[in-house]
């Protein structure tokens, strides 16, 4: 079902956050099933494919045999149950009626029914979700009318919500975002068929904060938007806060990235500086920091804010991230780039010196973040011995750090924001939306906290960093780096617990890894706080949801 459609629609699945290989991965996890005699099946026995004739006793007729197949009778039953969308209280009644009749005419067909049917039901629910998305997208025909887009988006949203857990989706995009994705996909298909970009589509309104560039004028912007919707799935990267689509333009030498904010999982921790402003300052400075260039910023046909950046991955391949830690040469490159950031003139950026210094501001910000967490997350934190915002503020207030000259910071140097062997060669830093002005020590310590780093590598990086940066940027670092490590351990305990409680962004790789290591994170945080960790009773295996 998917293979014939994947070239045309695979990118749309990726934009929606739907993995394309979920059916295959699910099938690989299914244990060996009981043997049952194969027979003729109707794999699409749904309401639209059956006609009930009235008479002395009801009889079905007019069956649609176009989906006929041959195989395990449980497969046919599962397909019928899923496609009929019976209320949950009727499912068992239907299954028992089927089993009763099968025991009468073909007893071996019910062998292993209770054990094997749930696997077939889940498989069919995944299958139906893919099928429903394809059907809804195809139902548009050549239309880009808003009512048609919203209707298709509603159908897709319903299908994805019904199977989100089975698809491995931690959240489903809201219908407005789905409709926008459908518009881009549909309009891009129409443009490709017409072999030109009509004036009525992909109109562009420039954001004055990033004036039109001579090396990337508005006609290139429109062409980038016109091919975004039909980009293949392996060129679409959906992160915790942004959707990035890599496109190649005709007669333009390098790929570019169309970058949009996602609405599904709003980031609780917001950056202080606009990403475009940070990238502009870095580009103007001319320092040796490998970072994207901002090519355009503005609004598309649907009044959605869009940025276009240079693509910093290796040519023709997906970006590679140092998820298992930096190599020695890469560690040196990162330190050198942090030293170069210290040379950037950030006076044009909107930032004020925080009262009480950077660390006090950071601690206050974390305490405010904790106080604003949802009630469910706060209850979960209390159960695990984590303090509320007021007590956390008092605990963090005990620490002091030396004053160091403020510099431009990336703010979130996790491995997925670093690209190996990028366009400019060497290690490239991407995703600058958490940029800020502050203590240069913080960027390095946060990176070491978020990235697997051996002790000898940490010593190497600190030694190089302390020698590369100006003296006013490194004073007192030997005593202070642990304070920043404490605050990052504590932050992770709250951030990861919130994701576990709310389910936000759990499908992204960096979040999955953080959540999987939560027991270690919690132990480190309670140790940093000097508090006793409470024992949270574990749910018995018999009560866990499979």
Each model region followed by its residue ranges:
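Active-site acidic catalytic loop and adjacent metal/ATP-binding pocket
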Residues: 27-75, 237-248, 257-258, 395-442
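Active-site catalytic-loop/activation-segment of kinase and kinase-like phosphoryl-transfer enzymes
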Residues: 1-30, 167, 184-199, 353-399, ...
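Conserved kinase catalytic-core helix
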Residues: 1, 12, 19-33, 280-289, ...
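ATP-binding glycine-rich loop module of kinase domains
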Residues: 240-273, 280, 319-323
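Short beta-strand micro-motifs within the conserved protein kinase catalytic domain, predominantly
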Residues: 293-304
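ATP/Mg2+ or Mg2+-diphosphate-binding catalytic cores
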Residues: 131-211, 495-546
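Active-site activation/catalytic loop segments of kinase-like enzymes and analogous catalytic loops
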Residues: 74-108, 125-144, 441-474, 488-506
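Conserved short submotifs of the Hanks-type protein kinase catalytic core
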Residues: 302-316
């Amino acid at each position: 079902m998917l293979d014939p459609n994947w070239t045309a629609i695979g990118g749309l699945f990726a934009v929606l956050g739907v993995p394309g290989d979920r059916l295959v991965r699910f099938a690989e996890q299914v244990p060996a099933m009981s043997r049952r005699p194969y027979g003729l099946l109707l794999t699409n026995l749904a309401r639209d494919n059956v006609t009930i004739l009235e008479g002395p006793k009801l009889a079905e007729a007019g069956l649609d045999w176009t989906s006929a197949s041959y195989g395990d009778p449980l497969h046919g039953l599962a397909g019928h149950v899923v496609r009929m969308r019976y209320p949950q209280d009727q499912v068992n009644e239907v299954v028992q009626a089927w089993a009763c009749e099968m025991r009468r005419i073909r007893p071996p067909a019910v062998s292993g029914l209770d054990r094997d049917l749930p696997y077939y039901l889940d498989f069919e629910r995944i299958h139906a979700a893919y099928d429903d998305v394809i059907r809804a997208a195809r139902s548009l025909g050549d239309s880009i009318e808003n009512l048609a887009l919203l209707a298709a988006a509603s159908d897709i949203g319903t299908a994805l919500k019904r199977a989100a857990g089975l698809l491995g989706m931690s959240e489903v995009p809201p219908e407005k975002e789905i409709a926008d994705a459908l518009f881009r996909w549909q309009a891009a298909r129409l443009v490709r068929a017409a072999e030109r970009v009509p004036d009525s589509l992909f109109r562009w309104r420039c954001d004055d904060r990033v004036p039109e560039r001579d090396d990337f004028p508005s006609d290139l912007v429109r062409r980038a938007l016109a091919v975004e919707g039909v980009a293949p799935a392996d060129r679409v990267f959906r992160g915790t806060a942004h959707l990035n689509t890599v496109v190649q333009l005709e007669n333009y030498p390098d790929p570019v990235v169309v970058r949009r904010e996602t609405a599904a999982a709003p980031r609780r921790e917001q950056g202080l500086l606009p990403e475009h402003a940070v990238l502009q300052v870095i580009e103007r400075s001319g320092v040796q920091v490998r970072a994207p260039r901002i090519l355009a910023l503005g609004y598309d046909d649907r009044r959605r804010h869009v940025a276009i950046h240079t693509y910093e991955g290796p040519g023709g391949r997906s970006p590679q991230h140092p998820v298992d830690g930096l190599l020695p040469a890469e560690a040196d490159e990162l330190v050198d780039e942090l030293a170069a950031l210290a040379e950037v003139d950030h006076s044009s950026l909107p930032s004020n010196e925080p009262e009480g210094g950077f660390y006090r501001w950071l601690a206050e910000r974390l305490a405010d973040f904790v106080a604003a967490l949802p009630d469910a997350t706060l209850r979960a934190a209390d159960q695990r011995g984590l303090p509320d915002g007021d007590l956390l503020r008092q605990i963090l207030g005990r620490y002091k750090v030396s004053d160091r000259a403020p510099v431009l910071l990336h703010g979130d140097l996790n491995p997925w924001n670093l690209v190996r062997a990028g366009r400019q060669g060497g290690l490239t830093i991407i995703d600058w939306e958490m940029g800020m002005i502050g203590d240069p020590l913080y960027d390095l310590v946060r990176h070491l906290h978020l990235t697997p780093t051996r002790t000898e590598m940490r010593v190497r990086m600190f030694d190089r960093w302390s020698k590369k940066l100006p003296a006013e940027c490194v004073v007192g670092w030997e005593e202070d780096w642990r304070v920043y490590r404490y605050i990052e351990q504590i932050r992770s305990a709250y951030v990861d617990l919130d994701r576990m409680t709310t389910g936000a962004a759990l499908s992204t790789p960096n979040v999955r890894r953080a959540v999987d290591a939560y027991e270690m994170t919690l132990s480190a945080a309670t140790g940093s706080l000097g508090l006793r960790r409470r024992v949270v009773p574990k749910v018995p295996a018999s009560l866990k949801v499979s």
